[in-house]
Amino acid sequence: MAASDAHNNNKKRSNRRRKKRRTEDFSSSSESSSSSSSESDHEDLDEPEKEISKQDINIDDIDIESDNENSALTNDKGNKLIPQNLSITEKQQLSTVPFTTTSISNITNDNQIKNTPNINEISKNLDQKKTQLNNEFLKIMTTEFGDDLDELRKKPDFTEKSLVILAKTLQSGVNMFDIDVLNGLIQESGNTSNQ
């Protein structure tokens, strides 16, 4: 019984491969639509298996560096790659050479940011501004969706917890805008409500 199942599975597999080959190669007229299994058909079926196994090669497994490249470089304690053929004094001189900096790297230098004397005050002001913008955005959203919120309050399963969840959900929408866009939205809604 197991032998006949294996034979049927092989037959199904060969039919699938034959159909797949037909769709891939439109110009091939040597294959027929009959389901006869001959040795030539069996030999043709082995070729796609070889192709698939070649396609299954993982790119990460391929070594792209040659032995010559690996031996020419060494990994120093400071994670600096230094050629091996340099003398000790040349290596020391190389390690003392500072990295080049651009105006952007000078602006974004972490050490300068950390050494800013009033960094705590600046971050506190930013947090206050963010909280203020969040509250203003929540006011806009409750105004926009006021009718919908009233309808929800009338539902029997609406609780105080539901109100908190809705408010937090509406307020979290502020995160999809950057500060300039958010300021524009708040100013625009302030102008329309005053008119």
From Swiss-Prot:
It comes from the Eukaryota. Residues 9-21 have a biased composition (Basic residues). Residues 27-38 have a biased composition (Low complexity). One of its GO terms (biological process) is ribosomal large subunit assembly. One of its GO terms (cellular component) is preribosome, large subunit precursor. It is found in: Nucleus, Nucleolus. Keywords: Nucleus, Ribonucleoprotein, Ribosome biogenesis. Its main location: nucleus. InterPro entries: Ribosome_Assembly_3, Rsa3_C. Residues 1-61 are annotated as: Disordered. Associates with nucleolar pre-ribosomal particles. Required for efficient biogenesis of the 60S ribosomal subunit. Belongs to the RSA3 family. This is Ribosome assembly protein 3.
